[in-house]
Amino acid sequence: IYNNDFFPIDWPRVVLHFNHGGLVHTKGFKKVMKKRKPTMFVTHWDVCLSSESCFKVLTRRGLSIHFTIDNDGTIRQHLDINHIASHAGSKVNAKSIGVEVSSAYYTRYQNWYVKNGFGERPVIEGAKVHGSTLKPFLGFYPVQEEALKALMKAVHECTEIPLKTPLDKSGETSYNVSRTAAAAR
C-alpha cells in the first residue's frame, strides 16, 4: 500500500497489516498525509528468529519498519510506505522504505529452524567485513532472497526508486549510507 493505494507485488505470500495475521505499527513512525517520494530502499538483517519476533522487538524499542520478510518468504507490510518508518536514522528515514529480512544470524539457532520446519539455513563462511573475517553465520533462505527481489521490483514500479546498488567514491559497493549521500537524495 502506497498513499492508501494498493500496488501489486508479484509474489504468492503477501500479508498486509489489516489482513488476518497482519501486524501494524501504532507508534514509532511519522504519519504523512501528502504523498512523499522515497528515494532509497534500506534492507536490514533482523537477527531474530521470525518476522513476528522482529516486529515485537521493534515495537518495544519504539521503532518501525515498512516490510518484513519471514523464513518462508512471506512478505508482510506493516505500514503504508507513504508513512515514515523509524528504522535507519532520522536523515535516512524520511527518504527510505525499510525492510527487515528474518535470520537469527548465529549458527547456534540452526536447530531451531530445522525443528520448526523451515529446514537448514545456508551457513556463510569466510565473509569479510572491514578486513576482518567473520565467524560462520546463518544466511538467508533462497525463498527470502526471491521475495526481496519481488518486493524491490514492486516498490520500484510504484515509487520509481532506482534499482541500483549504492557505490562509494571509489566505485565499490557501499553498505552504509553516508550523511552526504543521505542529504543528496
Question: Which residue stretches match the model-derived regions?
Answer:
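Surface-exposed patches in mature extracellular/periplasmic domains of secreted proteins
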Residues: 158-178, 182-185
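Active-site-adjacent loop/helix surface patches within enzyme catalytic domains
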Residues: 2-162
